[in-house]
C-alpha cells in the first residue's frame, strides 16, 4: 500500500510538472505554440462571452 501510494504521488507530481513545465517553457520562450495558442483562445473567448 505504501509503495502504491508513493508511486501514485510521484506520478501525479511528474504529470503536473510535465504539463505545467511545458506551458511555462513554451510561453517563456516566446509563446512558440502552447503559450501563443492559450493567449489566442483566451482572447477569443472573452469577446464571445461579452
Curated annotation (Swiss-Prot):
Xref: Pfam families: Fungus-induced (PF10917)
Entry superkingdom: Eukaryota
Alphabetically ordered keywords of this record: Signal
A biological-process GO annotation: response to hypoxia
Secretion signal, residue range per the UniProt entry: 1-21
Its biological purpose: May have role in hypoxia response.
PANTHER family named in the record: FIP (FUNGUS-INDUCED PROTEIN) RELATED-RELATED, FIP (FUNGUS-INDUCED PROTEIN) RELATED-RELATED-RELATED
Record's protein name: Fungus-induced-related protein 15
Species of origin: Caenorhabditis elegans
Organism ancestry: Eukaryota, Metazoa, Ecdysozoa, Nematoda, Chromadorea
Gene field: fipr-15
